[in-house]
């Protein structure tokens, strides 16, 4: 009997806590994806397609190994006379021109001897450069 009385009192207390609010649920669209970081470029492009493939590691310039790639690319002049990475400007970044097979490149499209980078990966490099090529 005491249990039933306690259950009834608890039910009344819970009902008293309710509100008369009839707010509609609002759909909150997902946030935009986070910006592309240099770490993403290193882990998803340079490591599998450039450095670890043996093309740009150790003595082969520019060395794109983790810990060295950023300093070897950003604001560093290419043999073609333009910076490998010109922060803020993919069209003036030789690396971007090479991966998109743009006009004026010396040699072949990168990565050489392998499949071209996907459009998503190329877009990631473009975004990173457009953001100023931060070392994040």
PLM features: what roles do these ranges have?
Residues 10-12:
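Short, linear, compositionally biased motifs with a strong N-terminal bias
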């Amino acid at each position: 009997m005491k249990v039933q009385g306690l259950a009834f009192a608890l039910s009344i207390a819970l009902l008293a806590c309710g509100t008369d609010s009839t707010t509609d649920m609002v759909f909150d669209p997902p946030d935009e994806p986070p910006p592309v970081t240099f770490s993403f470029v290193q882990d998803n492009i340079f490591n599998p397609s450039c450095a670890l493939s043996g093309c740009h590691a150790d003595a082969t310039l520019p060395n794109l190994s983790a810990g060295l790639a950023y300093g070897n690319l950003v604001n560093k002049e290419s043999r073609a006379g333009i910076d490998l990475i010109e922060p803020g400007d993919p069209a003036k970044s030789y690396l971007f021109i090479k991966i998109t097979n743009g006009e004026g490149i010396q040699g072949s499209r990168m990565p050489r001897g392998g499949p071209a980078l996907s459009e998503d990966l190329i877009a990631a490099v473009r975004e990173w450069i457009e953001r100023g090529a931060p070392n994040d």
